[in-house]
Regions:
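Membrane-interface junctions at transmembrane-helix termini in multi-pass inner-membrane proteins
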Residues: 81-112, 123, 152-156
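Helix-loop junctions and terminal segments of transmembrane helices
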Residues: 7-41, 94-99
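Alpha-helical transmembrane segments of multi-pass membrane transport and lipid-handling proteins
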Residues: 13-14, 36-87, 118-122, 126-127
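Residue-level recognition of pore/gate-forming positions within transmembrane alpha-helices
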Residues: 4-5, 51, 84, 110-115, ...
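Structural signal for membrane-spanning alpha-helices in multi-pass inner-membrane proteins
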Residues: 54, 121, 148, 152, ...
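Membrane-proximal transmembrane or re-entrant/amphipathic helices at the cytosolic face
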Residues: 178-221
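Membrane-interface helix-loop junctions in multi-pass transport and translocation proteins
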Residues: 104, 111-145, 177-192
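Interfacial/gating helices of multi-pass transporter permease domains
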Residues: 1-7, 71-75
């Protein structure tokens, strides 16, 4: 249910993104490198920080939305959410391949990651059960995403915010550990801390929004 919410939201965004990419490609004078670099980095930030905020929220609301007989499944949520995010990002990158007429890469990146997923499922499920299935999904989509990012870096010269990615991975581990081993109050604290971090991560956007609001107020005055 929780991953379906993410998928629904991102599907709507991807439809709009598809239109934007085609318009960008039609305007050949646009800065493709700058446009796609900014779009990819911001998209990863929004999804990454969004899921880190969602995880402690799920911990709190889980008993109210999910029947008590499924309480044991609560531990599987973080890894499955991360797998969903990896899937969404790979789809997002796929739209760029389509818009830039690099469809030839879509097939073999999908086949490679799909093959790896099938292999890892058979290896990990006997060891970790359902958690192994989620992990194999995460591995498959992460490999797909990494391959597509490497290709885009080569073809369009995009540059990734590696500092944020490293920080996100570290924070994701901490938030997941708090979710699995912590109590309700530790997850509430986790939510607050991640929320504060979001203010720093998106400070540039927030400042632009505040400046825009001030300008509108000044014009009305």
């Amino acid at each position: 249910k929780f991953s379906s919410f993410i998928t629904l939201f991102t599907t709507c965004f991807n439809l709009a993104w598809q239109e934007i990419t085609y318009v960008t490609e039609a305007n050949v004078n646009d800065d493709r490198k700058g446009f796609y670099t900014q779009a990819i980095n911001y998209y990863m930030r929004f999804l990454g920080m969004g899921v880190l905020l969602l995880i402690p929220v799920v911990y709190v609301i889980y008993p109210f939305f999910i029947n008590e007989s499924y309480s044991a499944a609560k531990v599987y949520v973080p890894l499955y959410l991360f797998a969903t995010i990896a899937s969404v990002i790979s789809e997002f990158l796929g739209e760029i391949f389509t818009a830039t007429k690099m469809n030839r890469y879509l097939f073999w990146t999908t086949v490679t990651s799909g093959t790896l997923n099938v292999i890892s499922v058979h290896v990990l499920i006997p060891i970790w059960g359902v958690q192994g299935a989620s992990l194999s999904l995460l591995i498959g989509f992460c490999v797909n995403t990494v391959m597509r990012l490497i290709i885009l870096r080569k073809e369009i010269s995009i540059s990734l915010d590696l500092k944020f990615l490293g920080f996100f991975i570290l924070l994701a581990v901490v938030v997941s550990m708090v979710y699995i081993h912590g109590a309700i109050w530790s997850n509430i604290i986790s939510f607050v801390i991640v929320g504060v971090i979001c203010l720093f991560v998106f400070k540039d956007i927030l400042l632009q929004i505040l400046q825009s609001i001030k300008l509108k107020k000044n014009k009305k005055a």
